[in-house]
Amino acid sequence: MIRILVSNDDGVNAPGIKALTEALTEIATVLTVGPDRNCSGASNSLTLTNPLRINRLDNGYISVHGTPTDCVHLAIRELYDGEPDMVVSGINAGANMGDDTLYSGTVAAAMEGRFLGFPAVAISLNGRKFEHYQSAAVYARRIVQGLLAQPLAKDQILNVNVPDLPLDQIKGIKVTRLGARHKAEGIVRTQDPAGREIFWLGPPGQEQDATEGTDFHAIANGYVSITPLTVDLTAYGQLTALQNWVDKI
């Protein structure tokens, strides 16, 4: 039977990972390994200065005192008896579109699976109330089944964003590119109860590029967005111009 590793960045007890695990258990043997706390914004960070501690939970999940990337790396390298056929990360409580992907622990967990040689998908639910995890779970299962039936190129990650809508209100799937946000809003300066100065990072910026063809546009119009991401960050279109610049300095 197909074997799928499920992880996330919201934590192993988050509702999204539960909905995803249950949906994929219908088609595969699932191992669920997630952080023991919310690690949103962890990106691709690894824990290198402390040991990783795990806890095997009563529901069969494994919690890790580490980052999403730690979870996937540890699961594949040590916790799995053999190897998974695929890595699926999510369902994230919140969008991972445009610039979000660089900060996202959800995308990073999928990326680690891709680094280690496995097909990988990141699933996120875009909304404010996060009421329709089941809608995202249905699309996650559909996409995973599609990948199993017709595998895609091995150098890509599928970044999937689902609008927080009832299933019958979602219009379908759009293949998209990443949009872009304006820079994040300002830092919030305040004090703790002892009067010491503390700071909170402001919320992400509003959409800057949400034109047709972007993930932002698809979600705003009631579609699921699928964006292929690559691990290779090289700006190939700039290589010649950069070489010409280097030759002159």
Curated annotation (Swiss-Prot):
Main location per the UniProt record: cytoplasm
| CC cofactor note | Binds 1 divalent metal cation per subunit.
Which EC number(s) does the record attach to this protein?
Answer: 3.1.3.5
Keywords on this record?
A: Cytoplasm, Hydrolase, Metal-binding, Nucleotide-binding
Q: Where in the cell is it found?
A: Cytoplasm
GO cellular component terms, semicolon-separated: cytoplasm
Q: Name one GO molecular function term.
A: metal ion binding
Known catalytic reactions = a ribonucleoside 5'-phosphate + H2O = a ribonucleoside + phosphate
* Name of the top EC class for this enzyme: hydrolase
Look up the record and name the cofactor or cofactors this protein needs: a divalent metal cation
Which of this chain's residues are annotated to bind a divalent metal cation? D9, D10, S40, N92
Q: Does the keyword Transit peptide apply?
A: no
Family recorded in the similarity comment: Belongs to the SurE nucleotidase family.
What job does the chain carry out? Nucleotidase that shows phosphatase activity on nucleoside 5'-monophosphates.
Q: Could you tell me which NCBIfam families the record lists for this protein?
A: PRK00346.1-3, PRK00346.1-4, surE
Q: What is this protein called?
A: 5'-nucleotidase SurE
